[in-house]
Structure formats: structure tokens, C-alpha cells
């Protein structure tokens, strides 16, 4: 049976409460599990919460290292959710981090339009053509250990150019917009 992994990390930096990085990702994974629990899908969904992301992805690296070659082949992809609920006046912005940079451009309005088209009931309300949608290469979250062994993997992250309050004492619920989750 094929598997899709939806993940987040539950640890935080040493001097941080971790409300947004990554309590928001954990909340999103739990909410997705609740929403999808009775949905018929032609593959399994594994909801995984990793520890050690702030220490060079120790949890996800360990998990990937324990997978057999056959288990790796059964994974159709990984969607990791990391830091998505910072308050912002700039609208909703998403940065999709993967292991390969697209050849087209850093800003991909066509990709945004395709996402909105796929889910008109909710996604189009969150992401509009005036918002920014990034596709970028990144090696700093729990998708990366999967990508290193050629498992398709991405992280969904709020736009880091927005000046996020993370990895310090400002990463508290008062600086979050819970509706973004």
C-alpha cells in the first residue's frame, strides 16, 4: 500500500516557547487528521510529529534512516508543515520548500492559480493572485531527509521574508493569527 506522510516538528529552539515554530504546524497536522479521518483515499496517510528538527532534523533523519528500501518505495510523498501562523498585514503567503528549484522563477503566480483552482472552496479564499507564493529550495526542515533519499518531499512554510517571530522569546501565541492554521 502506498503512503503519503503529513508531518510537523513539535520541538522548539532553546529560548523559545515554540507557539508558531512549530505549534502551528502541529495544530495543522492534527486538524488535517481530524478532517481526513473518514475520507476514502486510495493510499494511506501517515500523520507524523517529529522531534529534533531544531537540532538538524534528528527525528526525521532517524525515521528515514530506519526505513527499508521497500518502505521508501511505498512513500508517494511527504508534506511537512512548519511555522504557518504569524500575524501579518501582508496577507496570506506560502513558501513551498522542496529539494529542487524550479527553472521558471522565484515567484510562481501560475502555481498559485493552479492551487486556487484545485480547491475553490477554501484555498482560493486564502491565496489570491495579489498574494505571494514561493517555490524555493531548502534544506532546513523535516522534508529534507526524505528528499535526500529521493522521496518527493516539500515543506509548507509562511513567507520568511515577513520577519517572523521565531526561535526566541517572541514566538508566543500573542504574535500568532490562529485563523491561518
Kindly label every feature range from the protein language model.
Residues 4-5, 77:
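Conserved beta-strand elements of the Class I
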Residues 6-56:
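Alpha-helical metal-binding/catalytic segments enriched in His/Glu/Asp
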Residues 13-15, 87-90, 163-167:
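Short acidic/His/Gly/Ser-rich catalytic and metal-binding motifs that mark active-site loops
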Residues 18-21, 25, 52, 104, ...:
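Residue-level preference for long, well-ordered alpha-helices that form the structural scaffold
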Residues 52-155, 160:
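Metal-dependent peptidase/peptidase-like ectodomains
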Amino acid at each position: 500500500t502506498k503512503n503519503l506522510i503529513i508531518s510537523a516538528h513539535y520541538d522548539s529552539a532553546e529560548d523559545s516557547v515554540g507557539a508558531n515554530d512549530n505549534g502551528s504546524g502541529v495544530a495543522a497536522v492534527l486538524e488535517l487528521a481530524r478532517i481526513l479521518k473518514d475520507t476514502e483515499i486510495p493510499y494511506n496517510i501517515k500523520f507524523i510529529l517529529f522531534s529534533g528538527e531544531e537540532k538538524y532534523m534528528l527525528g526525521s533523519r532517524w525515521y528515514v534512516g530506519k526505513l527499508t528500501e521497500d518502505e521508501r518505495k511505498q512513500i508517494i510523498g511527504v508534506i511537512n508543515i512548519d511555522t504557518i501562523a504569524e500575524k501579518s498585514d501582508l496577507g496570506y503567503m506560502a513558501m513551498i520548500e522542496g529539494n529542487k528549484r524550479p527553472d521558471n522563477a522565484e515567484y510562481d503566480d501560475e502555481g498559485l492559480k493552479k492551487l486556487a483552482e484545485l480547491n475553490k472552496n477554501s484555498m482560493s479564499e486564502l491565496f489570491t493572485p495579489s498574494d505571494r507564493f514561493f517555490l524555493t529550495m531548502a534544506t532546513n526542515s523535516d522534508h529534507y531527509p526524505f528528499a535526500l533519499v529521493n522521496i518527493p518531499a516539500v515543506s509548507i512554510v509562511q513567507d520568511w521574508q515577513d520577519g517572523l517571530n521565531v526561535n526566541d522569546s517572541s514566538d508566543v501565541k500573542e504574535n500568532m493569527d490562529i485563523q491561518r492554521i
